[in-house]
Amino acid sequence: MEWELLADVPADALRKLLSVARRRTFAKNEVVFHRGDPADSLQLISKGHFSVQIATPLGDIATLSVRGPGDAFGELALLSRESVRSATVTAIEPGETHSVYRDDFERLRREYPSVNDVLIGILAEHLRRLSEQLIEAHYVPANRRVLRRLREMAELYRGSANSVVVPLTQEDIAGLAGTSRATVNRVLRQEERRGTIELRRAKTVVLELDELSRRAR
């Protein structure tokens, strides 16, 4: 398994880092950590998908992102000893991660100064995501944001089959798109009538990913 976050880490440093990482397995719907928990480790995903969620001021649960194999979460734990988890992360299906604890990472930084590039990459990625979200929120209509998030999730879950099952609720998609469930339902119903998707209980089947991608531009 390769992780984009660690792509620039020297091979010998990467081997050492993974040798001290601790393998963890999670059942479907098992919580990895809650928002506000002490943050002490980076989680590298090797199997399964994980939702990153927060509670809104109104008490609703908003899904901020979904991460899959080759991705990671909990990156901010490597930046500060005083940090706490900024969101709750839950396994969408059975999954596996490799935990890199901050103390182990600090020792590796001292031995391999080039590992500092990982921290720079973390900050750069967070800034990129925040910038994209801000631009979309101001300039991209809600219906297109819904289609873009559905396309991204379909690409994340895509296998060898022609159709792609996205096991997320409409509330999840609303959180990802920064809009209401009613808007998501309206947009998805329109797409179902066009034949690009099929709606099922707590999931969406993408039948025409190329067409969905074209409409999401």
Language-model features, listed with the residues they occupy:
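Cyclic nucleotide-binding regulatory domains
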Residues: 5, 30-93
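Polybasic "coupling" helices that flank or enter modular domains
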Residues: 92, 110-178
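Cyclic-nucleotide recognition modules
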Residues: 14, 65-124, 128
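Cyclic nucleotide-binding regulatory module and flanking cytosolic helices
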Residues: 1-28, 77-79, 111
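A residue-level structural signature of the nucleotidyltransferase/glycosyltransferase Rossmann-like core
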Residues: 6, 64, 97-100, 165, ...
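A conserved hydrophobic position in a structured secondary element of the catalytic/binding core
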Residues: 9, 45, 68, 92, ...
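Phosphate-/nucleic-acid-contacting segments
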Residues: 153-217
